[in-house]
Amino acid sequence: MWKEKKEARSSRKFIFLREERYQLQGLRNENYIEAHLKVSCLIGESDQVRYMVEMPVYKQTNEDGMYKWVGDLHELRERIVFSLNENGQIGVIHNISEIQLKWDEIKSKVFLRHKNEKYRNMLIKGIEKVLSNNDQLAGALRFAMPYLLLSPGIHSREYKKNEPVSGYR
């Protein structure tokens, strides 16, 4: 049995700030992100460890194109409970059913908000595909900010000179 949120072993609060600027030929983009995070360590039976990341605040300045989708889908990332894999990265999402229920709640609102977008059906099918499989959801979050900074998997041990590393690139 897992201990309740109030019985977490430890928790820390972070503010994630990110400034993105891209320019590719004539295309230019700027985006500023602010996210408030609370990361808790939960201890269960047999001293199994799970981490809970709560992100109650997520603000971004750019709401054009795909950035609008990121803001609309933030509710799905408000509370994520996961354990780490053998590489120290996000391994298993333990509250995937809760995330799927949230998606069912907001799906119609997202569909209506993006009704004039050409690729809306393809994006919604992609979201449903990722949410239907724990491995795909964990893989999607594993290299997404700010989760990459919380559990990068490369800082937990030393690597030998020629040892291959499975990381972001």
What are these regions (language model features)?
Residues 1-169:
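Signature of exported/secreted
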